[in-house]
Amino acid sequence: PILKHHASAILTGALKNMMGLTTRKTNVTFHLGSGKRNDPEYLAQCIADLNLVRKPDLTVADATEFITGNGPAGPGPMKKLDLVVASTDPVAVDAFGATCLDAAPADILTVYMAYEHGLGEMNLEKLAVAEFEV
């Protein structure tokens, strides 16, 4: 996925990317199922729960240039980092994505809920990070 802002989920990254595996009907349920359109807490819980069903084996996320507001469709402010992030931990990818949006990982509900489910680590200080130039 391209790391970016999302109006309801705040962040589109590894965790939300798994919504691409669902049917249109399921996607609509995620957005409307609480009875309130695009309820952030309900959507975040659905996304975290979906990742319990099938956690990604590897996420390669594009953080070269991305929208930081009014996403995902825009128009909105852009940020250029020229980075690609890869990990077997989708929570870590999205925790990093949160920092790209100048947010604390725990403030992104999908990250926090997935962390609480035991799907990965949101504390970036606990992770081994390797950087490569290409």
Indicate where each model-derived feature is located:
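Extended, low-polarity segments enriched in aliphatic/aromatic residues
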Residues: P1-V134
